[in-house]
Amino acid sequence: MWTQKWHKYYTAQVDENDCGLAALNMILKYYGSDYMLAHLRQLAKTTADGTTVLGLVKAAKHLNLNAEAVRADMDALTASQLPLPVIVHVFKKNKLPHYYVVYQVTENDLIIGDPDPTVKTTKISKSQFAKEWTQIAIIIAPTVKYKPIKESRHTLIDLVPLLIKQKRLIGLIITAAAITTLISIAGAYFFQLIIDTYLPHLMTNRLSLVAIGLIVAYAFQAIINYIQSFFTIVLGQRLMIDIVLKYVHHLFDLPMNFFTTRHVGEMTSRFSDASKIIDALGSTTLTLFLDMWILLAVGLFLAYQNINLFLCSLVVVPIYISIVWLFKKTFNRLNQDTMESNAVLNSAIIESLSGIETIKSLTGEATTKKKIDTLFSDLLHKNLAYQKADQGQQAIKAATKLILTIVILWWGTFFVMRHQLSLGQLLTYNALLAYFLTPLENIINLQPKLQAARVANNRLNEVYLVESEFSKSREITALEQLNGDIEVNHVSFNYGYCSNILEDVSLTIPHHQKITIVGMSGSGKTTLAKLLVGFFEPQEQHGEIQINHHNISDISRTILRQYINYVPQEPFIFSGSVLENLLLGSRPGVTQQMIDQACSFAEIKTDIENLPQGYHTRLSESGFNLSGGQKQRLSIARALLSPAQCFIFDESTSNLDTITEHKIVSKLLFMKDKTIIFVAHRLNIASQTDKVVVLDHGKIVEQGSHRQLLNYNGYYARLIHNQE
């Protein structure tokens, strides 16, 4: 009873690392607001590891709330020294970092909101809470500027236009179903004629004629059933295109920071979420238009047969509704729980398969299998709980249906004995009763499907709410506008609310210059390179990057990446032919001669020619049939086939032998019409470029030519000395 008072403020986490965001939204609901978790995620700068306490404080302040993280103990909580509700950081079950919202403190218990949808708003004993609490609390209260805001949420109703688009197909399905229903009613009525008319009067000719007609009708019904099933499959596929492909396309349009703050399994698990939405949309459409029609048509016929038996049959309706209501909350909780467990398992499997080489080299198979076994067992356990609830509901409905059938026959027999109903009418009524109860069951069965779809739709919308990096209108939309110097002006950058990776970096890279960025691991070299190509953006009011005096925030992301080609240390090779990999992102009109030249340039042409089918040789996923050096050379050739005028090679030759590396680097340096940026540990490359930029702890400590920096005898000179 006490928990019901607070349940209206409850918010469930969508993904495993959303617990802090859900807790924050519970506080926001208490103060009259309601935000989408995707919005709060951006404000709190949530990463794949979750949300920090600092992130929650910053997000709350951004929404005009006073927020302060404090350290407290049970005495302070019990003595009401902490204003409630309050967010607390815990180690759930003494191992999982998590957040609760404490709503109320009683003599022996606390009323908490747990973002875990399997728990929700509940009581927890003070002793158990004390074991889990890290004694960190976040006190939040509105400021004078605070105004409640309730963000609109997309619901399943928003998907109705997808169904309207398929109205012709849906109309054909409904028409086919109407025809088959009429034939079924006619078939049931035939039994009444046999018993009440043909048998008593020995009407053999009429019996044969009607029987042959019904055989033809049933054959026609089979054809119509096939057509209806085919159209239903087509409807499902068209909805799949509108929902699943739309989600895939949106994923590819999202900015890079979306992928760095989420697990792959969280994204892939939403494909199965989409199938739940499609199932619900298809079922809802057919049920509303088809089953409702059948229910009405058969119901009228049954009422015509015997109104008393029909009224008896209607008793099942409130019983079915009660069954649905009893299972509603259970299905909602179990659906959310199963989807989350599936996402966690997918992430673990994908991560393990991606790192299989490391697992095998460390003989970590047993540990990995144990981890996956645990997650798989958890998913099976939660899926079993869902299936138990579903089968329990189905069993109750089946029992109700059987009991009703017996009651109808029992009561109907009395009508026959009193000559108020013929035997044929009773048998016909009983036969048609199934056609009445089946659509009624279909309507009732919508409940778990719609609940699963609602949860799945919420999960999909959390991704759709992340803005595409291509949605913003940008001024620069032509490559020709970018031919000029690259300027980095006082740029600072960090990931989340961590300390700065780059600190007040200023750098000018003249057009067609060749430079090398060097520094120890973690100095910010790769981060700077990714900022140049627009994978991440500098913090607001913390500097800017310009190309030919155009801020890169004003440059179309497609044009920016066509102008600057970033080649990472670990290039990704896609499953497909060598040629398909080379042509990915290539400039228009690439000829075989150009491909040969690029491959010769990258010292990979001979290797390709030695493959079984040359350029048409199929490569496995991630290029497992290529060496690390071959992958790097292939990626360099691929970059040379792009329209890029500037190349960033981020340790892109680290797996090459020194002779091959020297050949390729020398050729790159000879490209007078290209800007070349090397990010390197091997300082022999730095000695060949026009300029060397030295980074240390996110700051440029030195820059100049190789000779100038050696003469300066500073940080760079020490790096050279240590490498020798």
UniProtKB/Swiss-Prot annotation:
Peptidase C39 domain ranges (all copies): 13-140
EC number in record: 3.4.22.-, 7.-.-.-
This protein's record includes keyword Zinc: no
Active-site residues annotated for this sequence: C19
Domain annotation ABC transmembrane type-1: ranges: 170-452
Compartment annotation: Cell membrane
GO process annotations (BP): protein transport; proteolysis
Transmembrane feature ranges: 170-190, 207-227, 284-304, 307-327, 396-416, 426-446
Chief localization: membrane
UniProt keyword list: ATP-binding, Bacteriocin transport, Cell membrane, Hydrolase, Membrane, Nucleotide-binding, Plasmid, Protease, Protein transport, Thiol protease, Translocase, Transmembrane, Transmembrane helix, Transport
Topology term for the membrane: Multi-pass membrane protein
Function: Involved in the export process of the bacteriocin pediocin PA-1/AcH. Is also essential for pediocin production.
Annotated protein name in UniProt: Pediocin PA-1 transport/processing ATP-binding protein PedD
